[in-house]
Every structure is written in C-alpha cells, then in structure tokens.
Amino acid sequence: KLHPLVMLNISDHLTKALMDINESPVYVLLNPTINHAQKKMLNSRIRVLHQYLGSMQK
C-alpha cells in the first residue's frame, strides 16, 4: 500500500496531467505548437500515471 504523501503526490500529478493535456495524448504529441519541453513534461507525468495505475492493479 502506498504512503498517504505518495498518494497526494500522485493525485497532484494526475490533476496536472489532466489539466495540461486537455486533449488526447496523440493530439499533444502531434501538435506543432507544443514545444519539446512541454512534451517532455507531459510524458513524465504520463509515465507517473502509468506507474500509479500499474501499482493499483497489484
């Protein structure tokens, strides 16, 4: 089971990722107006979400 502070951090990442993406991940990655730094940040947040969801399945 994850520590409550870790859960808060994950929840924060989830909220930010959903607010930042606001579109499908494919749109974000293909949108030429989104710069490399933004894509990198979004990818890191998506990675955190993926790890979180994976841990919830165990």
From Swiss-Prot:
Its main location: cytoplasm. Keywords: Cytoplasm, Developmental protein, Nucleus, Phytochrome signaling pathway, Signalosome. One of its GO terms (biological process) is red, far-red light phototransduction. GO terms for cellular component: COP9 signalosome; cytoplasm. It comes from the Eukaryota. It is found in: Cytoplasm; Nucleus. Component of the COP9 signalosome complex (CSN), a complex involved in various cellular and developmental processes such as photomorphogenesis and auxin and jasmonate responses. The CSN complex is an essential regulator of the ubiquitin (Ubl) conjugation pathway by mediating the deneddylation of the cullin subunits of SCF-type E3 ligase complexes, leading to decrease the Ubl ligase activity of SCF. It is involved in repression of photomorphogenesis in darkness by regulating the activity of COP1-containing Ubl ligase complexes. Belongs to the peptidase M67A family. CSN6 subfamily. Component of the CSN complex, probably composed of CSN1, CSN2, CSN3, CSN4, CSN5 (CSN5A or CSN5B), CSN6 (CSN6A or CSN6B), CSN7 and CSN8. This is COP9 signalosome complex subunit 6b. It comes from Brassica oleracea. The gene is CSN6B.
